[in-house]
Amino acid sequence: MKDQIVFKFPDKSFYYEEDFCVGENNYEAYKLIKEWPNWSFKGINIYGPKKSGKSYLTKIFSDKAKSKIFDSKNINKNNLDLILSQNVLIIEDIDFFSDEVFFQTILNDFISKNKFIYLTSNKLSGSISFKLKDLISRLNSLVTVAIT
Protein backbone atom coordinates (compact mmCIF):
# COMPACT_ATOMS: atom_id res chain seq x y z
CA MET A 1 0.00 0.00 0.00
CA LYS A 2 1.60 3.23 -1.14
CA ASP A 3 -0.66 5.84 0.41
CA GLN A 4 -2.44 5.71 3.68
CA ILE A 5 -5.87 7.27 3.83
CA VAL A 6 -6.31 9.50 6.85
CA PHE A 7 -9.78 10.13 8.17
CA LYS A 8 -10.40 13.37 9.96
CA PHE A 9 -12.91 12.84 12.73
CA PRO A 10 -14.52 15.75 14.53
CA ASP A 11 -13.12 16.82 17.86
CA LYS A 12 -15.08 15.12 20.65
CA SER A 13 -15.17 18.38 22.58
CA PHE A 14 -17.59 19.85 20.05
CA TYR A 15 -21.20 20.00 21.09
CA TYR A 16 -23.62 20.33 18.19
CA GLU A 17 -27.17 21.31 18.94
CA GLU A 18 -28.49 18.98 16.26
CA ASP A 19 -26.85 16.06 18.12
CA PHE A 20 -28.46 16.92 21.45
CA CYS A 21 -31.05 14.38 22.49
CA VAL A 22 -34.11 16.10 23.95
CA GLY A 23 -36.19 14.01 26.32
CA GLU A 24 -38.57 14.49 29.20
CA ASN A 25 -35.61 14.78 31.60
CA ASN A 26 -34.24 17.90 29.87
CA TYR A 27 -37.10 19.24 27.76
CA GLU A 28 -37.93 22.23 29.98
CA ALA A 29 -34.31 23.42 30.12
CA TYR A 30 -33.85 22.98 26.36
CA LYS A 31 -37.10 24.83 25.66
CA LEU A 32 -35.99 27.80 27.79
CA ILE A 33 -32.62 27.93 26.04
CA LYS A 34 -34.39 28.00 22.66
CA GLU A 35 -36.61 30.88 23.89
CA TRP A 36 -33.68 33.07 24.98
CA PRO A 37 -33.39 36.14 24.79
CA ASN A 38 -37.16 36.43 25.06
CA TRP A 39 -37.20 35.37 28.69
CA SER A 40 -39.44 37.23 31.11
CA PHE A 41 -36.66 36.80 33.70
CA LYS A 42 -32.94 37.58 33.79
CA GLY A 43 -31.42 34.57 35.53
CA ILE A 44 -31.56 30.80 35.40
CA ASN A 45 -30.01 27.93 37.32
CA ILE A 46 -29.96 24.59 35.54
CA TYR A 47 -29.15 21.87 38.03
CA GLY A 48 -28.80 18.13 38.06
CA PRO A 49 -26.37 15.30 38.68
CA LYS A 50 -23.09 14.84 36.85
CA LYS A 51 -23.47 13.50 33.31
CA SER A 52 -27.05 14.76 33.05
CA GLY A 53 -26.30 17.06 30.09
CA LYS A 54 -25.80 20.41 31.84
CA SER A 55 -22.52 21.13 30.03
CA TYR A 56 -24.01 20.19 26.67
CA LEU A 57 -26.97 22.52 27.23
CA THR A 58 -24.59 25.22 28.44
CA LYS A 59 -22.54 24.96 25.24
CA ILE A 60 -25.70 25.29 23.15
CA PHE A 61 -26.70 28.35 25.18
CA SER A 62 -23.20 29.84 25.01
CA ASP A 63 -23.19 29.61 21.22
CA LYS A 64 -26.59 31.25 21.03
CA ALA A 65 -25.69 34.02 23.52
CA LYS A 66 -22.20 34.50 22.05
CA SER A 67 -20.74 34.52 25.56
CA LYS A 68 -17.89 32.60 27.13
CA ILE A 69 -18.43 29.77 29.60
CA PHE A 70 -16.59 30.08 32.90
CA ASP A 71 -15.96 27.23 35.31
CA SER A 72 -16.42 28.35 38.90
CA LYS A 73 -13.12 26.72 39.90
CA ASN A 74 -11.20 28.94 37.45
CA ILE A 75 -12.79 32.30 38.23
CA ASN A 76 -10.52 34.78 39.97
CA LYS A 77 -9.54 38.43 39.95
CA ASN A 78 -7.18 37.82 37.01
CA ASN A 79 -10.09 37.14 34.64
CA LEU A 80 -12.60 39.55 36.19
CA ASP A 81 -12.43 42.03 33.28
CA LEU A 82 -13.13 39.24 30.79
CA ILE A 83 -16.04 38.00 32.89
CA LEU A 84 -17.60 41.44 33.29
CA SER A 85 -17.25 42.14 29.55
CA GLN A 86 -19.63 39.29 28.65
CA ASN A 87 -23.18 40.00 27.49
CA VAL A 88 -24.37 37.01 29.50
CA LEU A 89 -22.79 35.59 32.64
CA ILE A 90 -22.38 31.84 32.15
CA ILE A 91 -20.84 29.93 35.05
CA GLU A 92 -20.74 26.17 35.40
CA ASP A 93 -20.56 24.24 38.67
CA ILE A 94 -21.34 27.07 41.07
CA ASP A 95 -21.39 24.45 43.85
CA PHE A 96 -17.58 24.71 43.83
CA PHE A 97 -17.30 28.51 44.04
CA SER A 98 -14.88 29.13 46.91
CA ASP A 99 -14.99 32.93 47.20
CA GLU A 100 -18.59 33.83 48.00
CA VAL A 101 -17.94 37.57 48.23
CA PHE A 102 -16.31 37.57 44.79
CA PHE A 103 -19.18 35.51 43.36
CA GLN A 104 -21.73 37.91 44.82
CA THR A 105 -19.81 40.88 43.41
CA ILE A 106 -19.96 39.37 39.92
CA LEU A 107 -23.68 38.59 40.24
CA ASN A 108 -24.41 42.09 41.52
CA ASP A 109 -22.60 43.63 38.54
CA PHE A 110 -24.67 41.66 36.04
CA ILE A 111 -27.91 42.30 37.93
CA SER A 112 -27.23 46.05 38.15
CA LYS A 113 -26.63 46.15 34.38
CA ASN A 114 -29.79 44.13 33.71
CA LYS A 115 -27.77 41.41 31.96
CA PHE A 116 -28.71 37.74 31.76
CA ILE A 117 -27.27 35.18 34.18
CA TYR A 118 -26.99 31.46 33.40
CA LEU A 119 -25.64 29.14 36.11
CA THR A 120 -25.31 25.39 36.48
CA SER A 121 -24.93 23.32 39.61
CA ASN A 122 -25.30 19.78 40.87
CA LYS A 123 -28.09 20.80 43.20
CA LEU A 124 -30.61 23.61 43.45
CA SER A 125 -28.66 26.87 43.77
CA GLY A 126 -30.57 27.98 46.84
CA SER A 127 -29.66 24.78 48.67
CA ILE A 128 -25.90 25.08 48.15
CA SER A 129 -24.22 25.67 51.50
CA PHE A 130 -23.24 29.28 50.90
CA LYS A 131 -23.02 31.44 54.01
CA LEU A 132 -23.69 34.95 52.64
CA LYS A 133 -27.40 35.69 53.04
CA ASP A 134 -27.43 38.19 50.17
CA LEU A 135 -25.82 35.64 47.85
CA ILE A 136 -28.37 33.02 48.86
CA SER A 137 -31.15 35.54 48.25
CA ARG A 138 -29.79 36.35 44.78
CA LEU A 139 -29.59 32.66 43.92
CA ASN A 140 -33.10 32.02 45.24
CA SER A 141 -34.43 34.69 42.86
CA LEU A 142 -33.29 32.73 39.79
CA VAL A 143 -35.59 30.56 37.73
CA THR A 144 -34.56 26.97 38.43
CA VAL A 145 -34.82 23.99 36.12
CA ALA A 146 -33.87 20.45 37.08
CA ILE A 147 -32.52 17.94 34.59
CA THR A 148 -31.73 14.30 35.24
Report residues per predicted region.
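Conserved RecA-like P-loop NTPase ATPase core
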Residues: 20, 29, 46, 110, ...
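Post-Walker A helix-loop "phosphate-sensing" segment adjacent to the P-loop in P-loop NTPases
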Residues: 62-73
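Short regulatory helix/loop adjacent to the ATP-binding pocket of P-loop NTPases
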Residues: 125-140
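A short, basic N-terminal segment
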Residues: 1-35, 40
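Conserved P-loop NTPase "ATPase switch" module shared by AAA+ and STAND
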Residues: 82-106, 113-122
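Catalytic-core regions built around general acid/base machinery
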Residues: 57, 61, 102-113, 134-138
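Conserved AAA+ ATPase "SRH/arginine-finger" region at the nucleotide-binding site
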Residues: 142-148
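Walker A/P-loop nucleotide-binding motif
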Residues: 41-58
